[in-house]
């Protein structure tokens, strides 16, 4: 029985099982995952986030801010701690149960007292402890993998939102120029029509082009606002104004990346 008890023991790891997630994140994403388990650690992370936000964000910086700051990811980290606690609890000895009964009765002028004390153990839980620990270890390992996967998912969504936001804002700037040109064209068409050099059809065509350009710009502005708000949420920031982005997307590479072993890797 002692062997069963010893084999079922489990204890908390110094890092709460987070090192596996951190190493996987560094290897697959190239980012630093940190779990703020104290106020001091949270302050250090906040300082790092402030430094990253002090300049226009690059794509990798945006991913790093999201990993540091995303509230959903913080919840996943705490789920990892809960999973480890369940694993450790499965390896703890079940508490014994102590009960005492005290009775008395009087008979023939004599009072008799009766005291019963019972100490019980959950023998079934004790015997099945090693199996329970093994199950919780597997659950803990699965939680580690799921947490690392959640980090990768957040990084992917952040990259998409980052480039989508820059593209949306670049489209707004382009469509503003289009609207300005269309507005100038509509104004010129109106003046030309007034002096008889444009007929009504030509004027209506220019006016329609201006109205279409204005509508396209309004839609682009709404899409830009929505894209920036989504990026703000992924980064865990309180306001879209906290983000500074480059004015344009990076140039495409002149040559495609060479991936000779991509088929074998796939």
Segments the model singles out, each with a brief description of its role:
Residues 1-65, 221-265:
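Terminal intrinsically disordered/low-complexity segments used for targeting and assembly
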Residues 4, 82-83, 209-213:
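A short structural micro-motif
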Residues 44-55, 99-128, 132, 245-259:
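Small/polar, glycine/serine/threonine/aspartate-rich low-complexity segments that form flexible
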Residues 59-71, 98-102:
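Glycine-/proline-rich flexible loop or hinge segments
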Residues 63, 116-118, 162:
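Membrane-embedded beta-strand positions in outer-membrane beta-barrel channels/transporters
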Residues 68-75, 81-96, 107-109, 117-135, ...:
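A glycine-/polar-enriched beta->alpha junction
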Residues 93, 101-105, 122, 185, ...:
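Outer-membrane beta-barrel pore domains and translocons
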Residues 129, 145-265:
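Periplasmic alpha-helical coiled-coil/stalk elements that build and connect Gram-negative outer-membrane
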